[in-house]
Structure formats: structure tokens, C-alpha cells
From Swiss-Prot:
Protein residues bound to Cu cation: H114, H116, H131, H181
UniProt site (Not glycated): K41, K92, K238
Subunit organization: Homotetramer. Directly interacts with ATP7A; this interaction is copper-dependent and is required for SOD3 activity.
Gene: SOD3
Disulfide-linked positions: C63-C208, C125-C207
MF terms (GO), sorted A to Z: copper ion binding; heparin binding; molecular adaptor activity; superoxide dismutase activity
Pfam families in the cross-refs: Sod_Cu
Record-given protein name: Extracellular superoxide dismutase [Cu-Zn]
Function: Protect the extracellular space from toxic effect of reactive oxygen intermediates by converting superoxide radicals into hydrogen peroxide and oxygen.
Keywords: Antioxidant, Copper, Disulfide bond, Glycation, Glycoprotein, Golgi apparatus, Heparin-binding, Metal-binding, Oxidoreductase, Secreted, Signal, Zinc
Family to which this protein belongs: Belongs to the Cu-Zn superoxide dismutase family.
Signal peptide: 1-18
Length: 240
């Protein structure tokens, strides 16, 4: 493709010489300067095309989690980030969840995380509305029903692939809220109305609004994920 662009540039240069009546074998200084300018522009365009191709058309989004403004002093202050990547508009969603600030006891407790309908944090996480449920299906079949996450030593770090939510199309979660709950999701098995609406997951501890971003945050988190896996394998080998 770069060769094609350069060929077009040379043809254009020849045409420029013909229009000015100059001998194409000895272009004047104006023609040489024009060729240099055009070459710089073509190079810039080519670099942009290659950068976009390297991104493979993937969509990225980030959500900076902050404690709900309505929490009382006794509640934990959960902070962190949730990152999303979708390789194509119809592809499944991948996500990194990296949160801290949970109580350290009891260890290995589970917390629910869901997408809620509104990106409205004017009244803390309470104003984010119900679960985002564009297809009017029962919980836990909402696209943003991410389920339960194990908390260890006050933090939560997890990679999940194949999520049903999307960053593209009419049911995009961009502009909506991710909410971290105080309790565990009963996955619709609680036997009451709240169970099929929100999984009886308890108070809304922290939340954020999903926003489009570049690939940099995801790439850094992916490198950290790879390093964590490597350290875990090394630790397991030493223990064995």
C-alpha cells in the first residue's frame, strides 16, 4: 500500500512538471519542495493507517470506581478501575476488574458487580437506577450481570472474558454505570422479587460511569495480568 501511495506521488510530480513546462528529468526547486511536502503528508497518512490497523478495530472503555457519596462513615471506601475491550462490534466483551478498599475480614468474601441503567452519580450510586435490562429479561440474564467476585485481603483483581455486555450497538453500556455491591449476588435463586431484579446484592458501595478510552490502559493491565500469572506459577513451583 505504501508503494502505491508513493507511485501516486511520483505520477503527481510528473504531472506537475508537465503543467509547468519543465523537463521532468530536471525538476525545478518548487517541484522538489512540493515533492518533499507531499512525501511528508503521505508518510503521516501511512503511519496513521498502520496505527489503526494495529488496533484491529478494537473498542476500549474505562470506568474509574469511586465510593458512593451517600455512604456513612462505617462503610468501606472501595476504589479502583474496571476496563473493557471488545475486538469487534459483534464480539463478546472482555474485562479487567481491579478494586481495593474492601474489609479484610472475612477473607475470601464475594461481592456482586453489575451495570446499572443510568450514568447519573448526582446522588452517589443510588441515582444509577436499576440494572440495565434493555431486553426485559429476569436477573441474572441482564447483559451487565457480571456475577460475584472473590475478595482477598481487602482487594479484588480479576480478568473475565466472554461477557454478554457490549460497547457498541443499541445496547451499548457506554455512558451507563458499573456498581459494586456490599453483598453477594444470589443469581436469581433467592425466591423473592428482588432476587430476579437485582440478586439481593445489598447496598451500593461504589460506582463509576463507563467511558470510551484508548488502548493504553488495557495494554498496561494486560501486561500486569501476564506478570501476575508468571509470579503465581513460580510460587506454585517453589511450593511443590
Amino acid at each position: 500500500m505504501l508503494a502505491l501511495l508513493c507511485s501516486c506521488l511520483l505520477l503527481a510530480a510528473g504531472a506537475s512538471d508537465a503543467w509547468t513546462g519543465e523537463d521532468s528529468a530536471e525538476p525545478n526547486s518548487d517541484s522538489a519542495e512540493w515533492i518533499r511536502d507531499m512525501y511528508a503528508k503521505v508518510t503521516e497518512i501511512w503511519q496513521e493507517v498502520m496505527q489503526r490497523r494495529d488496533d484491529d478495530g478494537a473498542l476500549h472503555a474505562a470506568c474509574q470506581v469511586q465510593p458512593s457519596a451517600t455512604l456513612d462513615a462505617a462503610q468501606p471506601r472501595v476504589t479502583g478501575v474496571v476496563l473493557f475491550r471488545q475486538l469487534a462490534p459483534r464480539a463478546k466483551l472482555d474485562a479487567f476488574f481491579a478494586l481495593e478498599g474492601f474489609p479484610t475480614e472475612p477473607n475470601s468474601s464475594s461481592r456482586a458487580i453489575h451495570v446499572h441503567q443510568f450514568g447519573d452519580l448526582s446522588q452517589g450510586c443510588e441515582s444509577t437506577g436499576p440494572h440495565y435490562n434493555p431486553l426485559a429479561v429476569p436477573h441474572p440474564q441482564h447483559p451487565g450481570d457480571f456475577g460475584n467476585f472473590a475478595v482477598r485481603d481487602g482487594s479484588l483483581w480479576r480478568y473475565r472474558a466472554g461477557l454478554a455486555a457490549s460497547l457498541a450497538g443499541p445496547h451499548s453500556i457506554v455512558g451507563r454505570a458499573v456498581v459494586v455491591h456490599a453483598g453477594e449476588d444470589d443469581l436469581g435463586r433467592g425466591g423473592n422479587q428482588a432476587s430476579v431484579e437485582n440478586g439481593n446484592a445489598g447496598r451500593r458501595l461504589a460506582c463509576c460511569v463507563v467511558g470510551v478510552c484508548g488502548p493504553g490502559l488495557w495494554e498496561r493491565q494486560a501486561r500486569e495480568h501476564s506478570e501476575r500469572k508468571k509470579r503465581r506459577r513460580e510460587s506454585e513451583c517453589k511450593a511443590a
